[in-house]
Amino acid sequence: MSLRVLNSVTPSLRGTVLVDKTALWKGRPEKSLVSSRVSSGGRNSRGVITVRHRGGGHRRLYRVVDFKRNKEGVPAVVKRLEYDPNRTAFLALIQYEDGELSYILAPSGLKVDDVIMSGAGSDVLPGNCLKLSMIPSGTFVHNVEMKVGGGGIIARAAGSYAQVMGRDGAYVMLRLGSGEVRRILSVCRATVGVVSNLDNRNIKLGKAGRSRWLGLRPKVRGVAMNPVDHPHGGGEGKTSGGRNSVTPWGVPTKGKKTRKRGKHSDKYIRVSSVKR
């Protein structure tokens, strides 16, 4: 996929850069693989805002994506590539030899009519799913499991990937996008390739309305608020905030370490992404 720079016919289109989706499916999603989705608007079960700057947006249907890829030894043909409003990556609709349909995350370079497969007999090609022990060092992978059979968790966003670094006994060393090197059980599955829509990081929405279509609400600066609403608020005239940047709850930002010390999973992290 490439980028599409819009002509400045109107002020809102000036500087707008979007991903070109002309090669994607233009019809409705597969009816058997969608379910209804109720937007939370950033609220919890009590109606309290737990995530700010969310709300509104276009109505969406949730596409049921197969993150486990546990149908081994059965080839599947890519029927079409689709846009998914619920994530930044594109989806691929695949059909197995027995007729079953499924959505998977589309890796970069996957095309319609390509044949993919999961399991021990699969080649190391984009879209094929194998155990980490069967993937050679240096290979880029995505949709990596952290628990055996639990489904892929690591590297699922557009353009993301992890790199197989080597073996460490029953584990495989993975370098994540953050620079962290982590040990994962070698029997966990991963899909070969980089997630599609690599140009997602380069888009420019161009206007506030396009953010609202995506369900994103305005982000008000703390220095523009009143003292009751934010530690940076208040003051006579325009101020700098008077202190180092903090969240509305007073927690320092811009470098503050948020991971708890002594977590059980620390033993699986060989190189941290945070420089101490």
UniProtKB/Swiss-Prot annotation:
Gene Ontology cellular-component annotations: large ribosomal subunit
HAMAP family documented for this protein: Ribosomal_uL2_B
SUPFAM superfamilies, per the entry: Nucleic acid-binding proteins, Translation proteins SH3-like domain
Role of this protein: One of the primary rRNA binding proteins. Required for association of the 30S and 50S subunits to form the 70S ribosome, for tRNA binding and peptide bond formation. It has been suggested to have peptidyltransferase activity; this is somewhat controversial. Makes several contacts with the 16S rRNA in the 70S ribosome.
Organism from which the protein derives: Anaplasma phagocytophilum (strain HZ)
Any one GO biological process: cytoplasmic translation
GO molecular function: rRNA binding; structural constituent of ribosome; transferase activity
Keyword field: Ribonucleoprotein, Ribosomal protein, RNA-binding, rRNA-binding
Keyword check for Ribosomal protein: yes
Protein name: Large ribosomal subunit protein uL2
Region Disordered, residue ranges: 224-276
Family: Belongs to the universal ribosomal protein uL2 family.
UniProt cross-references to InterPro entries, sorted A to Z: NA-bd_OB-fold, Rib_uL2_dom2, Ribosomal_uL2, Ribosomal_uL2_bac/org-type, Ribosomal_uL2_C, Ribosomal_uL2_CS, Ribosomal_uL2_dom3, Ribosomal_uL2_RNA-bd_dom
